[in-house]
């Protein structure tokens, strides 16, 4: 009898729903009967909206599941649900409210509701004190907007939603404003709303009075963009000379120490230039899309000066301001004295503040301001009363600051810092050497003669520009190599292609001799010819090449290879005094927009760990190990301890006059041997069992 009752369609809605989806026309009457019942239940619910109505929830889900089968009867159904939620969402039962929202999501997935109207309602429902509902609505909003823009960007819907979201971000309800901000950030990260309007709406949240909203907006501008990181990893490595090109060039010839060192030097220079071209993985695009970065940075600084937030939030403010100033090259002179107040070795998170000071420096900052910051760092950090780590951090910060603004360094201060090259602390001396290496490429004339190193073509051309001076070139530096190569190929070949070979005295020492390639000899001849040219003639040839022909990728590759050679070749007229120039690949200057904390905190020599750190490392390595002590199991676990165990725990003063102790101390060497033998035999028998 119970099975027969289950088959009655008016009371068994899941079965009726299944049948309607299969054959809608045959079950129209049953559907209309349920629809009329739904209308009556709606009227009853409106009388007491604060009380849960399970029957209404069941009917609403039934109507939502079958709405696509009878669209002519359910035209007003979505509007009825929206009006119920709009009017009664504050007093409605949470489960009832969730059911109505799920029904609307189901109708939206079937494309029976326009997205703009529904999403506006859902944004209003974010004010509800229901965490599960807010999470569901957040997921649907992000997914729905993603699906709307899947094939192509729907600008009409996007504009409507962005305008509405702009009001929601400024809503008085902190929870609704925070979730609206999270939606915009998520859509930007998914590359759906990545336009300037979205970024500038998010930027307004940086001035919110609610700390959670403020921190979320700051993190958006400071966070890393993972998609950009993946793109940079998959970037083609074919541009420019490769390591294989250098290997081929320097492997042709005798395998001696001189060629090996030349190859190592060339590989270091290549690595340096690869690092310069490597794109940053920070979220630059958002910072670049800010409409008025100068006004934005000024407002942030004003808010920072009057802020009473936690120190971590202040650090985020300083980080964002420094990035804005450094990337957009802004004039924000009040920021530098504010940062200088925190430049003390005992200051909390001082390495980050040093990073922000270097990050906010650029070549347009007046020298008197940047020199003040540099002098503060030198006076507070690079003194003998501080530890080696503090001095190292200070020199690293000075190096990064002067790499961005060379005019900040004075000749007197540079000579004082260069003397730390011979400091007893390895970290300090290596940091000072990296600073010397930086100025060998920027302006060797500021260094003392003993610190300048072997001059190269690149160092001869190095010059620090005056404040505000532009270095605009009407030619591509290094393009003269193309014209010289062309002249070389046009020369008539006088030889018949055969060369005589003889065993020289240098080759009789048993070393391997490789056949010289004609292409390598030609490249060396071209390099020698360019090196012998005066600077003006080089510029003239480079300008002629740049203006008279279109350069291919192969041409640019040759130009870059020639520029690399300038950093290796000796200056004209200089003899080879040193076989190799030391280049620390970890401490090379970078031309990126942002710095990393490792640039400031980098220590060449790892500091010794204290006892607590070593002990913590040892204990961490023992987490997966089992105890090696063999536990003796008793036949009866509840039995009392033996006399032997009691002896071990007995006070020594009670045992010192016992016969066993006295006889033990008076044993002869022979007795001890016998006792040792017996104990070893016992252990052996125990192991053999």
UniProtKB/Swiss-Prot annotation:
InterPro entries: ARM-type_fold (IPR016024), Sda1 (IPR027312), SDA1_C (IPR048292), SDA1_MD (IPR007949), SDA1_N (IPR012977). It comes from the Eukaryota. Belongs to the SDA1 family. GO terms for cellular component: nucleolus. It comes from Xenopus tropicalis (Western clawed frog). SUPFAM superfamilies: ARM repeat. Residues 668-681 have a biased composition (Basic and acidic residues). The lineage of its organism: Eukaryota, Metazoa, Chordata, Craniata, Vertebrata. This is Protein SDA1 homolog.
